[in-house]
Amino acid sequence: MIRLYIQCLILWIIILPLLAAREGFGGRCLKPKDKGNRSCGRSQKYYYFNAEKGRCYRFTYYGCKGNSNRFKKKSDCVSSCACQAVLDHGSHCKSKAKRKEGSKVRYYFDSESGLCRKFWYVGCGGNHNKFTSKTSCKKVCVKDAPKRSKSSKPTSKTFSKNAQYSMNSLLRMLKNLSKKVM
C-alpha cells in the first residue's frame, strides 16, 4: 500500500507541474482563481473554473495580470473545462420537495470517448458536466471535437485531443487515489 502511495505521489509531483504549464493539456483549468490587480483598467465580471468542484464560478477580474483561468462567458468556461470534469451523480437532497422529485436522466460528456453519455442524476449538487439532453451536451462539449471517418488516419489535432483526455483521466485517478490513501 505504501509503495503504491509513493508511486502515485511521484507521478503526481512530476505530471501536475508539467500539465499546469501546458495550456493545451488542461493547464488553464487547473490554475487557481486570480483576480489580477487594480493597477490598470477597470474591473469586469468573468468566470473561472474551480477544478476541485468541477464547476465554473463568476468572479471580478480587476483588469491587469492574473492568469488564463478566466472566461468572458460561462458557456466558454463550461465547454473548455467543465466538459472534462469527472462524472458526478450528485447527492441526495436535504429538501423534502427535491427528494420527492427523485432521480433524473441526465447526460455528461465522457472525455475518454469524446461522447455524451446517459446517467442518473440524484438531484442535488454535482458539477457542470451535467446536461438535460444529449443534444445540449453535444452542443456544448462535442462542438470542437474533430470529426473523422473510420477510414481516415488520426491527425495531430486528434492525437492532441486523445492525449488530453488520457492526461485528464490520469490526473483524476491520481487525485482520487491520493485522497483515499491520505
From Swiss-Prot:
It comes from the Eukaryota. GO terms for cellular component: extracellular space. GO terms for molecular function: serine-type endopeptidase inhibitor activity. Residues 1-20 form the signal peptide. SUPFAM superfamilies: BPTI-like (SSF57362). Keywords: Repeat, Secreted, Signal. CDD domains: Kunitz-type. The keyword Repeat applies. Nacreous layer of shell (at protein level). Expressed primarily in the mantle with highest level in the mantle pallium and lower level in the mantle edge. PROSITE patterns: BPTI_KUNITZ_1, BPTI_KUNITZ_2. This is BPTI/Kunitz domain-containing protein 5. It comes from Margaritifera margaritifera.
